[in-house]
Amino acid sequence: MGDGMGQPTLRTERLLLVPLDDCHFELEVELDADPEVLRYLWGRARTRDEVVGSHADRMALAGKVDGLGYWMAFGTDGGRRGSPAPEDETGAEFVGLMMLPPAHGEDQPDDPTVAELGYRLARRYWRQGLATEASRALLRHAFDTVGQSRVIAQTMAVNTGSRGVMESVGMRYVRTFHPLWDDPLPGSEAGEVEYEMTRAMWTARRGT
């Protein structure tokens, strides 16, 4: 595992990934105000008070394993192909929230060497390959910098868009499981799916 690295700023061809901080709270509120963004998570927009709670949870999780946490993604020119990553977030376009916390859910392993990959993009940036681009950077960070043994990702089985990102970055399907929900969303009867990337898979993909 990495030693005292902190959570670094990351950069891709089109995106600047800045570690989540309290100054980003209003952007989280804006993101979660769109019910379509949360269709497969909450099935509705979230209130400001709900975002207060999730922001606090994210900030706490970001400190549990050095180098892991949450990033706010910023871009330029609508995230179009060929658009450059901004030099800094000042004046840049907010694209979404990228996630790589330690695994922590009820249906996830209690193992600090396992991280969970996630992504939540503002709707105007969908279908441009930005979630895939950011996910590749987070996987590289997880294995090459932090030293994780495994990265998992979970979503509703019917969420074909999210599953497509997982498959496009080389993750493999592991299982379908059926959590018990108090207020199940449409499509939840098909269950949740889990994908993974192991260190061995990552090494093989890099040809080393």
Task: List each model region and its residues.
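Acyl-donor (CoA/ACP) binding surface of acyl/acetyltransferases
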Residues: 1-40, 54, 74-208
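Active-site rim helix/loop that mediates acceptor-substrate recognition in acyltransferases
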Residues: 44-68, 72-82
